[in-house]
Amino acid sequence: MRILIVEDERSLREGLTDLLAAAGHEVVAHENGKPAADCGTREAFDLVLLDLMLPDIDGIEVCRRLRRARPALPILMLTARGSEDDKVAGLEAGADDYLTKPFAVRELLARIDALGRRAAATPADPEVVEADGCVLDLGRLTARRG
């Protein structure tokens, strides 16, 4: 799977990157919400791990932006904020799952696998659409004629 990690805490971001790469995933990591949201709307990902507390825009706003651009993209909130209100806000913003820190690595990997299975079972919207001599690449957000 191609996974986008959005986590401002450097040691956790690097640890998650190493863990997921060792498990065979391709990982792109960002520490700030705005560049991560831009990346997640421009590029194709199979899953997003998203922290709630980020230095520029919060994870709720990143989640909303990603959800608008990619309705079927699995998003797992991974955050220290574990109140009922925080969990409900994350899920209402479009997160598919919510895991509080600290977490067990096995549980995180199981949740990633579960979201991946669910996404694989759901037919995706076409990434490339062709009509009347025009080609729209929704994954790259480009259009060309001919």
Where are these regions (language model features)?
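Short, Lys/Arg-enriched segments at the junction into DNA-binding effector domains
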Residues: 2, 114-146
